[in-house]
Amino acid sequence: MKIAFLVGNFPVLSETFILNQIAGLMERGHQVDIYALDGPANHTEKVHPIVEKYNLLKHTYYSPTPPDNQLLRELKTNELLIDNFGRNPSACRKLLDVSKYGKRAKSFKLLYKAIPVLEGKSYDIIHCQFGSVGLMGLLFRNLGLLQGTLITTFRGSDISKYLKKWGDQVYDQLFAEGDFFLTNCEFFRQRAIQLGCEATKIRILGSGIDCSKFAFTPRYFPADGHIRIATTGRLVEKKGIEYGIRAIAKLAQVHSNIEYNIIGDGSLKEDFQNLIAELGVGSIVNLLGWKQQKELIQILDKSHILIAPSVTAADGNQDAPVNTLKEAMAMGLPVIGTFHGGIPELIENGTSGFLVPERDADTLAEKVSYLIEHPELWQSMGQAGRRRVEEKYDMHKLNDELVEIYQQQLNSKSTQSRVEQLTSSVVET
């Protein structure tokens, strides 16, 4: 199959779920082109090994980024029009139609995003990662810039935070005209249905991990009594890391033998540094920054407990069953998450770990303390977590399932086309 992946920025180090799907499709012999509508990811020296192994940048087409300065934007837009208007005059006019597209046309954003597909391209599948990207994919298809079966995956912020900003009707046209939809958990599937998506047009396809890269190790109480607790995730509000830090500060009052390592980076780094200093836990709480997968595995391998205190952010942002939790569970770590978004679909409360209410540092501290005091639970919880991930989130199984979904949609469209042709022939006679 010939497949177009439409994404925002690319490659994003934290979006391994997208990289895994692209690599899986390539391994299965399919052609994948990647369209990064928001341009390259923010500069970082670290590049995910999958990007290099599969030479993904060679298959990536970037939309130019509009300058923030209005004058510079107008100058650059004039250059773009001079260079590209002849490729598709009709589409360029439509993309600049303020009466139809409002601010998106007036700001020239639609034109910028469409530059890589102006001449029109045909695919078997157009797979849009995130609902907001699905809106652009639908627009491109309606303008004749892309042809193919349109599939959109909802992953979290696009069906939580995005709704709060743009309203519950933002996906009405996409639900009506898109061919099929995927989501990574039942929590967000039900939300899509509540918003108007037909239940028969959407199914769950979890975000998978390569279990073979996360070796299972039974956890035992360390001989030196030093307990290492970890959290992995971006330093943003919805990851709830503030409550992890507060819980550890409470815990340190009764357990002097703990260490808390936070792996990740983000906009709240300075806030967390200040909180750590304010609570006086700088000697036991470490902000380690972003780590390559190999480095992450080394840290988790030496850890005993992982906490993921996700919360619903002020902007409405929510989490699905996050891959960082799956990776820790695959490695045998007992985990503590929250009753939040899709997390309860991953963690079996009391079996592979514990769930606590959002923003409840006291209960989080109690559960961590309970695990420290009951190390006999670690091994059984770790084994249950590994089984859960292997059964529901194995990347290779899910990539096979993705190919099956693509094929089902193509077959359905082919059957529908034949029925329409037969109906037309009968009417004519």
Regions inferred by a protein language model and the residue ranges of each:
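Acidic anion/phosphate-binding donor-loop and adjacent secondary structure
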Residues: 46, 161-165, 193, 199, ...
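Conserved donor-binding/catalytic core segment of Leloir-type glycosyltransferases
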Residues: 182, 218-239, 245-248, 261
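Carbohydrate-associated surface elements
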Residues: 187, 208
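Nucleotide-activated donor-binding/catalytic signature segment of Leloir-type glycosyltransferases, i.e.
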Residues: 273-294
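A short, well-ordered alpha-helix in the C-terminal region of glycosyltransferases
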Residues: 281-284, 363, 370, 377-404, ...
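Acidic donor-binding loop of glycosyltransferase active sites
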Residues: 284, 301-316, 333
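Conserved acidic donor-binding segment of nucleotide-sugar-dependent glycosyltransferases
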Residues: 346-350, 354-361, 370-376
